[in-house]
Amino acid sequence: MKKEVIIALDFPTLEKTLEFLDKFKEEKLFVKVGMELYLQNGPIVIDEIKKRGHKIFLDLKLHDIPNTVYSAVKGLAKFNIDILTVHAAGGSEMLKGAKRAMTEAGVNTKVIAITQLTSTSEEDMRKEQNIQTSIEESVLNYARLAKESGVDGVVSSVLETKKIREQSGEEFIIINPGIRLAEDSKGDQKRVATPIDANRDGASYIVVGRSITGNENPEERYRLIKNMFEMGDKYVE
């Protein structure tokens, strides 16, 4: 499986989003459209990004009763995006329904389950979610549920990736957000790592936002991170 960097387009407006994408000229990217961008601007965001030939990870983190998620995914299938996220906490019937909706629509969109957010610490999880286990065990449990329910993969931090890979096999997609370079600030993420860490532990994709979008030269920073992720421990500055 080819390793790819997904750029998080965490912009509030379509105008700022397209202004950023136009800096990459002919380069075809894999980009993440999150709730802020999609809900504030609507489906036109998807249309404009697709017009430019970029792949889309629509990160809506759907979580509702199975029939509602099935119907929502059926509606989103018409965009023929590359990846869509749902919450593993929605349970097996919800996960199965989301995957079934894409299959029935005849599209190849990958359905990926969110495990624990990288902004969640173990203390947060125990106090606020009342899950009295380690965060690693919680993530591995959600990953097992996702695989058994037939979805294509999970989103997790790098910290759990190696064990998910061992548990779920080589074809299972693992997406790591919370990726930073050593000199970057953590922002609101708590469980973070570098592109080289993600490569070493077996991630399929990494999601990088501010490290690229907030850089004075985003094209150069993107290529640096791409090289680091593709080469892993073989990367030499």
UniProtKB/Swiss-Prot annotation:
Enzyme Commission number(s) of this protein: 4.1.1.23
Catalytic residues in the record: K61 (proton donor)
Key word Lyase present: yes
Record-linked InterPro entries: Aldolase_TIM (IPR013785), OMPdecase (IPR014732), OMPdecase_AS (IPR018089), OMPdecase_bac (IPR047596), OMPdeCOase_dom (IPR001754), RibuloseP-bd_barrel (IPR011060)
Residues given in the record as substrate binding sites: 10, 32, 59-68, 118, 180, 189, 209-210
A GO term from the CC aspect: cytosol
Keywords for this protein: Decarboxylase, Lyase, Pyrimidine biosynthesis
Catalytic activity from the UniProt record: orotidine 5'-phosphate + H(+) = UMP + CO2
Database matches in PROSITE patterns: OMPDECASE
Pathway(s) annotated for this protein in UniProt: Pyrimidine metabolism; UMP biosynthesis via de novo pathway; UMP from orotate: step 2/2
MF GO annotations: orotidine-5'-phosphate decarboxylase activity
Pfam families tied to this protein: OMPdecase
Domain of life (superkingdom): Bacteria
GO term, biological process aspect, one: 'de novo' pyrimidine nucleobase biosynthetic process
Role this protein plays: Catalyzes the decarboxylation of orotidine 5'-monophosphate (OMP) to uridine 5'-monophosphate (UMP).
NCBIfam families in the record: PRK00230.1, pyrF
Membership in a protein family: Belongs to the OMP decarboxylase family. Type 1 subfamily.
Subunit (UniProt): Homodimer.
Name recorded for this polypeptide: Orotidine 5'-phosphate decarboxylase
